[in-house]
């Protein structure tokens, strides 16, 4: 085995190794999920070299520099103050969702006007209008990290695949018998998965446009789906109160997670795929062992439905957003509530961590989005100006741009 090159992955922090084995080029990753700006670099480099035989003494200096660069990234933009950069009167009817490509260079908006629009983040200019759906465009996504394709899921029961560069439609995926309300690309960008009100999810081949497999078994609509980091498994959350883990290649049901007593609002894996987090209208989140499917813990404290939940990039922290107008941060290991975020005057429908993991972004029906300090729970900034409910908001991959989408038909770029 011969080490060819070392590459960086910023969020979550890691070093990718490209090496040659038996004439073949292979890759493996060293995950540095515990890395913080205060980590002692020399100690960590020593630990990395002990654990990874490919990294010999001659690479010590290079690895030290890489770890220092990762630390710099964790410090970057962490005290960023956002200002309103652009208001885009994006659509003639309300927006449904916003999504950014990994580079943050462009973003997309879905709307009740049956279109999806592609925007240039730097200028706020419209690049393309993706037309062709015959009903609301509800679920939208880029095939990150590549960002060269866009998927749109519609109430017209179809999903379309588009070129992000030209706006050309590659495929229309037909087969669902009711509205498509969620979708996701697998990490390899070879498959797109769609979840529907028809109680099924379908996986589609991006190259040939064919249906790969249908995931059947839920008794009510599927409103949440996501792949694990490897793309081998997919989870679906349903209004039937259950979450199912499936084998993505065969469509076989691996586990059914039963425990919630109301509709599921979100379901996702943590980074290392050891845990599954499920949020529900029963006011709780639950944690499950991703390998065995066994129940691990319940996160309690909210007084109303949980509308969104997420892990930070490393999987150490969990954030929950509720109709009770508060958000909470939990430690994923101890399952204790670390901080409570109070200040919104309406339900919080969206929550996400910045890539560095020290800030949270929330969007609310009180027409504001807010930036919070994860450790203290203090509100650092209120992003004001929308004249109706904010139901979609997102950080870019660097954490220095925020996009908000509102029922007021506009979206705003904050930077």
From Swiss-Prot:
Free-text function comment from the UniProt entry: Required for axonemal dynein assembly and ciliary motility in ciliated organs, including Kupffer's vesicle, during embryogenesis. Facilitates the onset of robust cilia motility during development.
WD repeat copies, ranges: 90-129, 132-174, 175-214, 217-256, 259-298, 301-340, 343-384, 386-415
Subcellular compartments: Cytoplasm, Cytoskeleton, Flagellum basal body; Cytoplasm, Cytoskeleton, Flagellum axoneme
Any one biological process term the GO annotation gives: cerebrospinal fluid circulation
Keywords: Cell projection, Cilium, Cytoplasm, Cytoskeleton, Flagellum, Repeat, WD repeat
Tissue specificity field: In early mouse embryos, expression is limited to distal, motile ciliated cells of the node.
Protein name listed in UniProt: Dynein assembly factor with WD repeat domains 1
Superkingdom in the source lineage: Eukaryota
Species whose genome carries this gene: Mus musculus
Broad class of the protein's primary localization: cytoplasm
Family: Belongs to the WD repeat WDR69 family.
GO cellular component: ciliary basal body; cilium; cytoplasm; extracellular region; motile cilium
The protein's assembly and partners: Interacts with IFT46.
Matching SUPFAM superfamilies: WD40 repeat-like (SSF50978)
InterPro entries in the cross-refs: G-protein_beta_WD-40_rep (IPR020472), WD40/YVTN_repeat-like_dom_sf (IPR015943), WD40_repeat_CS (IPR019775), WD40_repeat_dom_sf (IPR036322), WD40_rpt (IPR001680)
